[in-house]
Amino acid sequence: MHHQWLLLAACFWVIFMFMVASKFITLTFKDPDVYSAKQEFLFLTTMPEVRKLPEEKHIPEELKPTGKELPDSRLVQPLVYMERLELIRNVCRDDALKNLSHTPVSKFVLDRIFVCDKHKILFCQTPKVGNTQWKKVLIVLNGAFPSIEEIPENVVHDHEKNGLPRLSSFSDAEIQKRLKTYFKFFIVRDPFERLISAFKDKFVHNPRFEPWYRHEIAPGIIRKYRRNRTESRGIQFEDFVRYLGDPNHRWLDLQFGDHIIHWVTYVELCAPCEIMYSVIGHHETLEDDAPYILKEAGIDHLVSYPTIPPGITVYNRTKVEHYFLGISKRDIRRLYARFEGDFKLFGYQKPDFLLN
C-alpha cells in the first residue's frame, strides 16, 4: 500500500513538471508576427492619435508680425478704382484711338450730367446700366422725396418734377466750378451687352410705353438697313447692329434726337477724356462699387443703393452669343470699330469669339 502511494505521488509530480515546462515554452517562443499584428490592430483602433507639438522654428525678423493687419478689401478696393482711372488716362493719350476716345464737352454731354448741389455730386447718365437707381439716390439726396421707396416710377425720368437739375442748366462759370470741385462718377458695363439691353428695353418689351421707338425709330432703321425689303417682321437685332456700325449713322441720329442716349458710346455721353471723373463704377461689380461710391461721395450715412437682385449684374456671354448668332462678321466688326474706344477705356475684353 505504501508503495502504491509513492508511485501515485511520483506520477503526479511528473505530470506537474510537464505542465510547468509546457507553459514556459509557450510563453517564451510565441510567434512574434502574430503578436505584433495583434498589437498593430489594437493601436489603430483603440489608441487616440497623439499629435506632436509644433517644433519651434526660427522666424526671420522681417517676417515676424508687426501688429498691422494684412491688406483686406477695404485697402485693396481703392487700388481697383485708381487703376481704372489710370487706364482711362493712358487710352486718352493714345493718338491711334483719339477719334474713339475724345469728344467735345457739348450741351449733349452736359445734358447727361445731373447735379446734386447739396452734397456736391455730379452723376453722368449712361442708360441701360442701372441708372434709374442712381437717379433715385440723388433725388432723395436733393430732398425731393424722403426715401427711395416713396419715389413714383413715372417721376424718376420726369426731369421737370424729380428735382434733378442738369449741368447744362447752369452758366459757363458755374459749370466749370462744379466740374472742377464736385465728386463726379458714372457707371459702365460691357458695351455689347449694354446694346442688347437697349434693344430689348426699347424695341421688344418697352415697359415704359414709349411708342416712338417702335413706331418712328424702328421703321427708320428698317428702311435704311434691312437687306430683304419684302420681309415684314418688326425690327431685328441684326438691323440694329447694321445701323450702329454704319460710319454714316449720324444722319439718322439727328432724326432720332436724344433718344439715341440709350445706345451711343460712353465717350459720347460722358466725355471721360475731357472730364476728370472721381470714380468709374462697373455694372459687373456693382455690389462692391455702389457702397464704395456712396462712401467716397460722403453720403453713405444718408442713403443706401437699392438691393441688387442676385445674378443681375453678371456678364452673360451665352446671351451675347445668342443675339449675335447669324449676324455677319463684317457687321459685327463694324460695330466693334465704333465701340472700340469704350472697350479699351474701361478695360473690357475684345469679343474675339464674335469677331473671328
UniProtKB/Swiss-Prot annotation:
Keyword list (alphabetical) reads:
Carbohydrate metabolism, Glycoprotein, Golgi apparatus, Lipid metabolism, Membrane, Signal-anchor, Steroid metabolism, Transferase, Transmembrane, Transmembrane helix
Q: What class of enzyme is it?
A: transferase
EC number(s) recorded for this UniProt protein: 2.8.2.-
Q: Gene Ontology terms, cellular component aspect? A: Golgi membrane
Q: Per the record, what ranges lie on the membrane's Cytoplasmic side? A: 1-6
Q: What is its main location?
A: Golgi
| Membrane topology label | Single-pass type II membrane protein
Q: Per the record, what ranges lie on the membrane's Lumenal side?
A: 28-356
Asked if Ribosomal protein is a keyword of the record, the answer is no
Look up the record and name the pathway of this protein.
Steroid metabolism; Protein modification; carbohydrate sulfation
Q: Which residues are glycosylated?
A: N99, N228, N316
Listed name of the protein: Carbohydrate sulfotransferase 10
Organism, scientific name: Pongo abelii
Its lineage reads: Eukaryota, Metazoa, Chordata, Craniata, Vertebrata
